[in-house]
Amino acid sequence: MKAAKYLKIQGRFAMQRGHLINPTIAFETWGTLNASADNAVLIFTGLSPSAHAASSPMDPSAGWWEDMIGHGKPLDTNCYFIICINSLGSCFGSTGPASDNPETQEPYRLDFPVLTVEDIATSASHVLDHLGIDQLHTVVGASMGGMTALAFALEQPARCNRLVSISSAARALPHAIALRSLQREIIRKDPIWQNGQYDTDGHGPITGMRLARKLGMISYRSGEEWAERFGRERAPDFTESDTPFGIDFEVESYLESHANRFTGSFDANCYLYLSRAMDLFDGLDHGGSLTASFSSLQLESAMVIGVGTDILFPIVQQQALADALAEKVSDVAFVALDSLQGHD
């Protein structure tokens, strides 16, 4: 992450269920902040991305949202100053379970406080203070990032003019919580996990992470997309083996290669904490109902985007979020995308 910047929050950083001392938040920026500092767009990521959302002169490698950020693109750097933070609790520069605890000089591991989406949103406010930004033009997020964007708008209403929520919701449904619970159990059942005490410089619970990632990827796409993309095609390197349980099909090969790539780049404990944070978030906690929770919002407009084939955050959740926002916000757009891509 050659273009990453790092903000150390000095002193005690209060969290909903604990605190950190001098945590670091990694972030990247694109474009130029104007003289009135009112053209800033803040991006919150999903569970797994880093802050490297797009290429830049400092880091020309493609980012995970390359098609969205840049000259003439939807997040136009000719007009906006774009900020993307790496979530607190992650492993791409921001303080998380894999980071050293300054009080012990050892990784936090499971001594890291319980993490909430609100904690991630609060950490972003320190980045804005550091950059001299009092009020955002827009806050944007997809999946977990959409939850974080909503939490930011609820916790920092005066700093947020516009909200864009993509494939997200005000709370996770039981089936999504159940799926993530199974992913976490798969990781924790890996003998190498060792109650979170694995060597962070070594291999870690690779088998558990690989299987959890495969399960996640299945939920990120729709059955229709799998069928259209892979059908029952055999894997390109398919050969008859002595066991009937090898990788015979192209879809199996796809899952295997992507899971292996993810496992080599993401820390297991960080995954556990961020996954749980998604489960814990509930917009109703800010008022008892969405109507009451949203009463504090000061948004000029909001856009809620959903995908009809999304399994994790069904389109009915996007509609419900848009309807609840419309009770408080005068300009709310709901966009239902007709796509086979599902959550991804």
Q: Where do the model's predicted regions map?
A:
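Short alpha-helix in the alpha/beta-hydrolase fold that links the catalytic acid
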Residues: 286-291, 301, 314-325
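Conserved acidic catalytic loop of the alpha/beta-hydrolase fold
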Residues: 105-111, 118-138
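Short beta-strand/loop motif that positions the catalytic acidic residue
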Residues: 304-306
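N-terminal cap/lid subdomain of alpha/beta-hydrolase-fold enzymes
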Residues: 28, 36-101
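Alpha/beta-hydrolase-fold enzymes
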Residues: 165-261
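Catalytic histidine neighborhood in serine/cysteine hydrolases
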Residues: 322-339
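Catalytic-loop region of hydrolases
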Residues: 1-43, 57
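Conserved hydrolase catalytic core segment
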Residues: 135-178
